[in-house]
């Protein structure tokens, strides 16, 4: 079933193909005979009741530095000319990102958008996770220094990070003496308009944090990410390293609790982060990563599994 696929993502020349999940999805789509278009989110245009994008046909190959070829440029109608849109631009989850979800939501009745744009907009990664607070470490969202001091006094060492941050950027640890808490709150308040996330520091992070990928609500695989020496962050984008990992009983319980809701919302490709085998910290729905490392260690084909799910959904839509 050849499909026409439009990939909304960052510039192709900027990606690191050795670990980029979007690139893996494009390679898999191409191998299945699907036609690929590439465009940037700022190429979206709404006019006369239709959503368009200025896009290029593209082919990809797993050769570093020579990994893509752009073909003809065209203005494509995302509701009529393509079968599926992959919404894969990286955060920040700002008004530009939110606006793109509003525009893509307008073609949902015509074209499958992965992940569902309305669901992405309504599930900020560090806010929606609060619906599953029973699995989370102690967490506070605040801009108040007084509230932050009370939280730190209660929990000792804490971590502070931006509410809509990504890839481990601007994540800080505050020691038991709290000496750097006030300047960090001051800096965050000057930099961000939203509340900030404070969480009790989990010593188990020394053993890494686990990225678990779910495809259409089902576990597809997991890796453990170990932090670089002298860093508190385990993100691969921040210098962490991946290793093979199995799920604990609690992690399976977390996935079982999440799965039906992910499926109901149309969140087909999701990555969750778990520390210490039991503490859920984030639910990543905007542009999840990790499938390349998962497949490397587990001998799986997660990109293929994602395309199986996409193709099944398109068949269902066509049969309806």
What is each PLM-predicted segment?
Residues 22, 145-146, 153-157, 164-254, ...:
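Phosphate-binding site of ATP-dependent enzymes
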Residues 43, 211, 271-273:
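Short, surface-exposed charged micro-motifs
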Residues 7, 86-87, 199:
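Redox-cofactor binding/interface segments in oxidoreductases and associated redox assembly factors
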Residues 4-9, 114, 158:
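Short hydrophobic beta-strand segments
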Residues 10, 90, 163, 288:
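Flexible loop residues that form catalytic
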Residues 13-141:
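Conserved N-proximal alpha/beta basic substrate-recognition cap immediately N-terminal to
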